[in-house]
Amino acid sequence: MYSTLSDSQREIVFNKLGKFVVRACPGSGKTYCVGARLARLFHGWDKKHEGIAVLSFTNVAWQEIEKKCGDKFNIGKIPYPHFLGTIDSFVNKFIFLPFGHLVLGCNGRPTLVGEPHGIWSGGKYDRDPKKHFDICSFDIEDKIIPIGNVQAFGFHWRNNDGSINGNVVNLEKAKKELLGKGYANQSDANYFAMKILEKYPQIAKAIAIRFPYLIVDEAQDTSDIQMKIIDLLIENGLSEVMLVGDPDQAIFEWNDAKPELLNQKFSEWENSIVLNENRRSSRKICSFTFSISSLGSASISVNEQVCEFAHQPKVVTYNNNNIQQIISDFIEECQQYGINVSKESTAVIFRSKSIINEVLNIPEIAFRTNVWKDNYTREFARGKFLYDNGYFKDGFKIIERVLLKTLLDLSYCSENNISDVISRMGFINFKSQIYAFINSLPQSNVPIGAWIIAANKFLKEKNCKFEFQIHNDGSHYTFPQLFLNEGKQIVEKDYRYGTA
């Protein structure tokens, strides 16, 4: 089952010990390598209550590792005592949720709110700082910071003289009040997990004993707080750590990735290794990408089927006026080479979500425009938009939660809240009423202002005690403009598109 491993991969899978970084170039088979090392450890594991922790940054990434383990190494679902999942889920399960009360001062287990855990709609009025609880947190130096769309706050973070805006002071006060009640977003969970391990080293020691092997895939996406958590585990006894990643492929927009931290570990840990055999790209692509990478030497094309592919990579500079032409030229060139343009064969990838409007030719929302007067109006609109575009489960879940929050006047709708309502109404009756509500809302193929008017008419006819509200200057925006950054293929194209 290990016969296809290269010499470098075999070294990683069988011989590496202690703490080391695998710096992997694109196409080097790093996920296969992670799966192979996990399989090698797994098949020889004899401890009943200590396990291997394998972490990545998205559900898609860890599920790909699990699939590799099943398809290539005869392992099904990774069982207890091992853990395979996201770094956030590991932090939540083993540090923050069981021990968060020790640093928050709340009674009992904390409640995670905001994306991806559920919709936050706290705050009783438009300027209530509690409204923004889910889009702010703390950095490694304990300073409050925005983690969401800065336009949503409705104020500058700093004054012209550089001092902290008074609104931020009020926001921090409201933030700490809600933390004391046990609410936390995912960034808070990571921050306070770090604080827990700092204040209670015995917890860090227990986790290091529980998981004596740690493998982190896509480690270039690690934030300074997440790396500090790893360091604290190492300081308290964790000795087998494998960090795998490519600093040139870091995703900066969603978790404060600091790829330089991986580079530091690569330099500090003498056992580190470079995995630079590219199994995906031609020699010309490897040569080209070297010129824009931080690797010490070009990756080596080892796939005989594509190694000598003659197509010469191109560099074309773009601006707001020529992006559409560049995409059109690219699609035309694919067709000239006999490529059937589809989501399976063709992709338009961009580094930052900030240019998605230009890529999809959808006008951008003006800077500092705050469309929403409250969070629940936005969530009803978002849920309906996703539902109308075929993401039925996502849309249903959003509207189910925000409807209960609105009707029951909750800041957060938990699974327990949903279960309580189902126990009173019955499962089929409850779900049927949610579906009926969703399907009675107007279609989302109109500007948001027109949708609000039609939706409020429906709510009034049904004698609902709430209505949707937006600011007038945002009424002309369309749903695709408002919800482009959903991470889904909302706008239909023949090719796949998204961030790298």
Feature names for model-found ranges:
Residues 1-500:
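The feature marks helicase ATPase cores and/or their adjacent C-terminal helical subdomains
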